[in-house]
Amino acid sequence: NNFNDAAYRYLEHSNIQKFFAKKIVQFIKELNPQKKGEWIDLGSGPGLLADEIEKNFSSQKVSRIDFSKKMLLENKLSRKKILWDLNNDLPSEINNCSLLTSNFCIHWLNNPEKIIKNWFSKLTPGGFLIISYPTKDCFPEWKDTCRKIDIEYSGLNFLCSKELLKDFKSTEIHYSKQFNYLENFEDVYKLFRSIKNVGAQSTNCKRKTVKELKEIQKFWPKNYNNTVNLSWQIEIQIIKKL
């Protein structure tokens, strides 16, 4: 499991997750969810978002659910932690939640459209589900370079935001917006290492050969100082149980 292997490296490399964890907390402050009812972070990893929420809502305890045991062990000892495969419906004892969050997790799941309906069903009326995930418009530099040199694109194909929420009423969709986030690296070798370090290389394509990597490095668009960029597009969606 990529995520078990990446658990110890995750916190130092997860700048993009940290950035959007802070953004999600800003939204939670504006929404001011009910304090009664459980607050749970789904796919919590080492607890980045859950800790950030607790830092800003000192009276709230956030439960953490993840499918990587190593990731859960990186969390605070005193918090409720559940080891669970999020490809399955949530445990039946979870219900009446006033806040469910999920930062950078849903795109790993086998059937996100189905799973998000299950998560939504666990909310109490007035409760919020907040998710963030990379969209299918991520990594244009990588895709263009592969097209240019006729090499198979081996990155993940992320989600289409309209697809994900197609079963929800427009009144339930409280907020949906895309944000661009740019990472900058010395070269494509460091760029690919970074993708690997957050456990994000789970793709069925063959590993690139040294020759192919050299080609990619040569043709990837360069900045004036010869560095390379990786552009992410991240969607944040807030769904409200009426």
Regions inferred by a protein language model and the residue ranges of each:
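N-terminal, positively charged/glycine-rich alpha-helical extensions of SAM-dependent methyltransferases
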Residues: 1-8
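Conserved alpha-helix/loop element of class I SAM-dependent methyltransferases that forms part
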Residues: 15-35
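Local beta-strand N-terminus motif with an aromatic residue
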Residues: 36, 96-97
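Class I SAM-dependent methyltransferase SAM/SAH-binding core
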Residues: 40-90
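Conserved Class I S-adenosyl-L-methionine
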Residues: 46-48, 175-242
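A short SAM/SAH-binding and catalytic strip from SAM-dependent methyltransferases
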Residues: 98-112
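A short glycine-rich, Lys/Arg-flanked "PGG" loop and its adjoining helix->strand segment in the class I
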Residues: 113-125
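Conserved catalytic/acceptor-binding region of the Class I
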Residues: 128-188, 201-210
